Regions:
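Adenosine-phosphate binding glycine-rich loop
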Residues: 2, 6-12, 17-57, 64-67, ...
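Short, ordered loop/turn segments at secondary-structure junctions
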Residues: 101-104, 126-127, 181, 244, ...
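Short glycine/serine/threonine-rich phosphate/pyrophosphate-binding segments
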Residues: 129, 159-165, 225-227
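Glycine/serine-rich phosphate-binding loop and adjoining beta1-alpha1 elements at the start
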Residues: 48-147, 279-288, 295
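Rossmann-like adenosine-cofactor binding region
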Residues: 198-273
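Glycine-rich phosphate/diphosphate-binding loop of Rossmann-like nucleotide-binding domains
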Residues: 138-216
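Conserved acidic residues
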Residues: 3-5, 95, 174, 215, ...
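Short, charged/polar "capping" segments at the starts of alpha-helices
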Residues: 104-108, 183-188, 247-250
Length: 360
């Protein structure tokens, strides 16, 4: 039996308030104080992860800090708390630890955390990229668009996931607008990729203006708050929101939204897990499905590949190819489209496509 663990943490205080009615009556400042001082803990025992080649069990381990706290508290304090969480995984018998959400971007993106633990560590970003691009390609096709002729915007292009998406898509699309807060890293990336594929490049630090012409948007920044609003998007746009917390305003993807019912927003990396998996914890997905970052941890465990796989901010296409091959071997696959915990049906996509055609 292979063994893994994965770190969860509350993305916001609202997450905590949804879990417990009692918490709703606790003032925000007091709740932040409680979370800052609460020790990491075991969330649940995961069973039933089974491929034709191996079987695994695992654990969700909880780091109580919110995304906002991980950004604002001293880096050393946050890393110490994540390492404490990892030590629980070690004690449980896990041989590899996946870093969820903001735990994968603090400091040097997992390198220091891995150095301080006695088990392998991965951020899950390789499979996150692979499945985000797979989902984007399929969603673009269903919306009647030719990805080869599309203008793509990558929000958060200077980060590890964003730059990896740019490297892969540079061989597949016509134009890529690289968007992030700082222009310098974007210009370096554009210069590196220019001429490697068919795509031309532009760079921007202004998200609103950078999105108006985009047929396809991949949102991968680590912003704590929403940064994309309905008015920013082109009619008929396909938006893949990979980041946690989500980059796309709930107004965009609320069912049958009166504001923008002509835009398709999908969550990146919703994965079907082989076997009869029971997570014993509800994170808003249908049974037997999970985030791609969680899936990468399970895939590596099933393969017995207990090594630091995806760490740091340089994500290589070869890593993405490797994890994609292992995922296929063990029976992991994209589990359709979802947004804000709701399934997106073919009928819904056709309606969005129809609305976009009417607005032209």
């Amino acid at each position: 039996m292979e063994k893994f663990a994965f770190v969860l943490h509350p993305l916001s205080l609202e997450d905590m308030q949804m879990v417990s009615p009692f918490v709703r009556y606790v003032p925000d400042f007091l709740l932040e104080y409680i979370l800052k001082n609460k020790k990491p803990f075991t969330v649940s025992h995961i069973t039933g992860v089974k491929s034709p080649y191996a079987e695994a069990e695992g654990w969700f381990v909880g780091c109580p800090l919110t995304a906002k706290q991980m950004v604002e508290l001293p880096e050393e304090f946050v890393i110490d708390r994540i390492v404490e969480t990892g030590k629980i995984a070690e004690e449980l018998g896990a041989k590899i630890l996946g870093l969820g959400a903001f735990t994968s971007i603090v400091g040097d993106a997992g390198i220091t955390i891995a150095d301080r633990l006695n088990i392998a560590v991965t951020s899950g970003n390789s499979y996150t990229v692979a499945t985000a691009l797979e989902g984007t390609r399929e969603a673009t096709r269903l919306m009647g668009k030719d990805l080869r002729e599309a203008e793509v915007a990558i929000v958060g292009a200077s980060g590890s996931i964003g730059s990896a998406c740019a490297r892969i898509l540079s061989r597949e699309v016509r134009h890529i607008n690289l968007i992030a807060r700082r222009i310098g890293p974007l210009e370096e990336l554009a210069q590196e990729l220019n001429g490697q594929g068919a795509a031309t490049f532009s760079v921007s630090s202004d998200i609103k203006s950078g999105l108006h012409k985009a047929d396809v948007v991949i949102a991968v920044t680590s912003a704590v708050d929403f940064i994309i609003d309905p008015a920013d998007l082109k009619s008929g746009a396909v938006v893949c929101d990979v980041a946690r917390p989500r980059n796309v305003s709930r107004n965009v993807s609320r069912n049958v939204s009166a504001l923008r019912n002509d835009v398709l927003v999908i969550e990146g990396g919703v994965i079907h897990v082989p076997g009869d998996v029971d997570f014993r914890f509800d994170f808003g997905f249908p049974p037997k499905t999970c985030f791609a970052c969680m899936a990468e941890t399970m895939i590596l465990a099933l393969e017995g590949r207990y090594e630091n796989f995806t760490l740091g901010r340089n994500l290589l296409p070869s890593q993405i190819d490797t994890i994609s091959g292992l995922a296929e071997k063990h029976g992991f696959s994209l589990a359709g489209f979802r947004n804000f915990e709701h399934a997106i049906t073919r009928e819904m996509i056709e309606k969005i496509k129809h609305n976009a055609n009417l607005s032209r």
